[in-house]
């Protein structure tokens, strides 16, 4: 399947800035990947002494393979990049557009455990405006990968800057990392905040302060 123009532009912009997720070219179809993942997951679970003949476990390798390819890591495949609606700003709207409390679930690329949080995204319209739900879909696409929060924040920013043809975009993410909460230090109360600011959100203190004040969760 040919990639959409939006997917091609966003991927090129991320590669140009060194912000693309480290990944190899695709050499198999989604169904082929599921078969291979299921096989290897069966071996892993067996090495952990789990009895895969038990009716509670026998479908677990298949379920994990499907979950990886179709759901939690679907953002590794630009064939899944959301259909984007960008229109000319004919009404001349020039005030901040902000979408907040965007639910976000990703996966830590170091331990493959959950990152759970909320995102706020804002932009100042110039020549183009974007369908509001498309912002949520872009956040979800990049979250559906093994990630680090810093890169995720920047990927969302660059994607929207590219599609909207403006630098005036801001992204803030607050998230709980289960690699901190459920293992290692086992801190159940801490969270991590990252911001990525472009254009006037970075250069103008008043605009930056307005965004950050309104983006408080």
Curated annotation (Swiss-Prot):
Top-rank taxon, per record: Bacteria
Pathway annotation from the record: Cofactor biosynthesis; 7,8-dihydroneopterin triphosphate biosynthesis; 7,8-dihydroneopterin triphosphate from GTP: step 1/1
Gene Ontology process terms (BP): one-carbon metabolic process; tetrahydrobiopterin biosynthetic process; tetrahydrofolate biosynthetic process
Binding site for Zn(2+): 108, 111, 179
Source organism of the structure: Shewanella denitrificans (strain OS217 / ATCC BAA-1090 / DSM 15013)
Record protein name field: GTP cyclohydrolase 1
HAMAP family: FolE (MF_00223)
Keyword Metal-binding recorded: yes
Family label: Belongs to the GTP cyclohydrolase I family.
Keywords annotated in UniProt: GTP-binding, Hydrolase, Metal-binding, Nucleotide-binding, One-carbon metabolism, Zinc
Catalytic activity as recorded in UniProt: GTP + H2O = 7,8-dihydroneopterin 3'-triphosphate + formate + H(+)
InterPro entries in UniProt: GTP-CH-I_C/QueF, GTP-CH-I_N, GTP_CycHdrlase_I, GTP_CycHdrlase_I_CS, GTP_CycHdrlase_I_dom
Gene Ontology CC: one annotated term: cytoplasm
GO terms, molecular function: GTP binding; GTP cyclohydrolase I activity; zinc ion binding
Assembly and oligomerization: Toroid-shaped homodecamer, composed of two pentamers of five dimers.
EC number: 3.5.4.16
Alphabetical list of PANTHER family matching this protein: GTP CYCLOHYDROLASE 1 (PTHR11109:SF7), GTP CYCLOHYDROLASE I (PTHR11109)
UniProt xrefs under Pfam families: GTP_cyclohydroI
